[in-house]
């Protein structure tokens, strides 16, 4: 499976009143990606491990009029748990966490496997690669670190500021194999431009009006 990793090094996760967490910068980049990818008439799935991030992304998309009423079948946001059994042409995975000491749901092998295997054509992972590189030593974290290192080798690890993150859907067969191997290993073990910060108070997770 062709994949890219975007190192969102400037983002910081925050804890919501419901104890779920979100990441403003990852949400903003996610919406920017959707704006670019919708021109290709693809079904886009946005998945994340946290309900607060789903709400934030949905609210930001609505605020920017990214998804008109009734078109949520083409672009949708969901938690990993709710997404099981579903697929999309493109999956944008927002990892959210930026802590080097706590991986949270990233250390859950079942959730991680689901998140890495739902894309038909392209997987885009948004994460703080620097934080993950300094994370724990569980099998799942080691696999994530290996995925990041492989992305570096294949020149598919981008900084959040690089326009290359909107590149074409091409990848070598060995890149596809690498992602599949990681998944198998895990299985076995207004006039004002809206910002993410301005969308936190809205509660709905639906993408239609």
Residue ranges of predicted features:
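Conserved helicase/translocase motor-coupling segment
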Residues: 1-59
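Switch/connector loops and helix/strand junctions flanking conserved nucleotide-binding motifs
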Residues: 14-16, 55-57, 86-88, 100-103, ...
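Helical mechanochemical/support elements of P-loop NTPase systems and associated helical scaffolds
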Residues: 23-29, 53, 84, 108-111, ...
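Eukaryotic intrinsically disordered and solvent-exposed regulatory patches
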Residues: 32-33, 76-79, 109-112
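Conserved RecA-like helicase motor-core motifs
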Residues: 43-45, 62-79
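Conserved helicase motor
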Residues: 50-51, 77-83
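Helicase C-terminal subdomain and adjacent C-terminal extension
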Residues: 61-63, 102-208
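A short beta-strand element within the Helicase C-terminal
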Residues: 78, 86-98, 114, 122-125
